[in-house]
Amino acid sequence: MSLQTVLVVDDERDIRELLTITLGRMDLQVDAVGTVAEARRALGERSYDLCFTDMRLPDGTGHEVIELIADEHPDTPVAMITAYGNVDAAVSALKAGRCMSVKHRS
């Protein structure tokens, strides 16, 4: 049986490492990237069982990642994580696709 795969998209290295370690302990295979462009490449190479994406990225937004996944991999659930969350952003993310929003401390 192959491991389930998770894509983590966050520009903060510490967050990527934390999620990689935590999800790895749950026997999940993790690919972690820091930009929308890197996420686009990763999504072009494989399908994922789950995606965590930050809201603000250096070359775009988590909404772009959600749209990519909704268009190319509509069965993949997405969780948006951010230190800048608000209700409007969460509603927008939910409307964009299969997504939940989680606020983390900065």
Language-model features: where?
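Active-site beta3 strand of CheY-like receiver
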Residues: 47-52, 57
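Acidic catalytic/metal-coordinating carboxylates
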Residues: 35, 61-64
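Short amphipathic alpha-helix used as the core "switch/output" element in two-component signaling
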Residues: 41, 63-75, 92
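Two-component/phosphorelay signaling modules centered on CheY-like receiver
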Residues: 13-31
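The feature encodes the CheY-like receiver
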Residues: 16, 58, 86
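Short hydrophobic/Thr-rich beta-strand motif most characteristic of the beta2 strand and flanking loop
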Residues: 27-38, 42
